Amino acid sequence: MVEAALAEPDEVLNGYCRIEDEAAYRDPSVPKAVVAPDGRLLYMSRGPVPASKGGTFRMAWRQVCIYAFPRVALRAFAVHGVKSRLEDIEDIEILRFLEMGWTVRMVLLSDTSIPVDDPADVERVLAAIRSRGL
């Protein structure tokens, strides 16, 4: 992320990685990213997106909550003050940037991170740390 931020200092950046299992794809605590071929974020949802007509899991991307922002973008975010409409529905703050007209560039990251969205996730992190002898 640091390299991407240095290369694109005027861009709003957000990390993402591939979802490998269907359970994560269907889990509403995992924000799913819909990314254009050029790396722009098209949408992010807690719902299963992209979704096939038949409802089968094919592939998806998840948000890795690592960001880089230019100062002007953070200022605009703060001045906006309240959650935007979609941000409020999905509870995903990066959607505020999309609704304000910012382009969000997604940075592909390792899928080895463990998201911590609720207290039960802390044990998964501790187990991973112990398994590495740290």
Regions found by a protein language model. Name each.
Residues 1-83:
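Conserved core of the sugar-phosphate nucleotidyltransferase
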Residues 56-134:
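Conserved alpha/beta core of the MobA/IspD/sugar-nucleotide pyrophosphorylase nucleotidyltransferase superfamily
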